[in-house]
Amino acid sequence: MAALSCLLDSVRRDIKKVDRELRQLRCIDEFSTRCLCDLYMHPYCCCDLHPYPYCLCYSKRSRSCGLCDLYPCCLCDYKLYCLRPSLRSLERKAIRAIEDEKRELAKLRRTTNRILASSCCSSNILGSVNVCGFEPDQVKVRVKDGKVCVSAERENRYDCLGSKKYSYMNICKEFSLPPCVDEKDVTYSYGLGSCVKIESPCYPCTSPCSPCSPCSPCNPCSPCNPCSPYDPCNPCYPCGSRFSCRKMIL
């Protein structure tokens, strides 16, 4: 159990690290969609170090512009205007890095869920929801109409380059209760690894409460008897005879 706790702690630290790197990359991606030559120092553009008061790289290239010869990564020569939005190499790298971090984060969360599912040996646990990245006071659990709804919402604020940006992150998971579990008996807890466990005091039923016994083979109510050779009331053809039996009138 101690080894399992250490493993869960390491996975939780890795998830927090990936979340932090993902927020940083998202912030870089938001502010790298436009050229900041006249406002801020762009990592791939040296226009702020230009000897002229204004960025003249968008105009015809002159011999006096020595920085553009020294820095081939200056992208102002390839675009008509410096402030024109463009998909540069930094943006493509940021997008690829964000996708890689998302896949890595999803992989870590799946691993954590498998570990938690294997460690839950008691059958009174109805379900578990991973709410990594949310505080316990940001998680809400609602039980209504035979369903359990787990929701969480968080506000993120980024302070980048002197401006503030806000974004919201939320999650909502819903599942149905077994028919033998009462809504009033359902409890939840915020456990290790940022996982919300939904529990019930009684064991959930894996089969119907009153299973139907297999039906007994049906016997015919009135087994068929072999046909009588004739019916005294109605004329008939006796077995093996081509002539009908007629009543004799005396």
From Swiss-Prot:
Protein function: Component of the outer dense fibers (ODF) of spermatozoa. ODF are filamentous structures located on the outside of the axoneme in the midpiece and principal piece of the mammalian sperm tail and may help to maintain the passive elastic structures and elastic recoil of the sperm tail.
Coiled coil: none
The protein, known as: Outer dense fiber protein 1
Subunit relationships: Interacts (via leucine zipper motif) with TCP11 isoform 2 and isoform 3. Interacts with SPAG4. Interacts with KLC3. Interacts with CCDC42.
Post-translational modification Phosphoserine, affected residues: S5, S10, S64, S86, S122, S123, S151, S167, S189, S194
Upper lineage: Eukaryota, Metazoa, Chordata, Craniata, Vertebrata
Tissue: Testis.
Sequence repeats: 34-38, 73-77
Record organism: Homo sapiens
SUPFAM superfamilies named among the record's database cross-references: HSP20-like chaperones
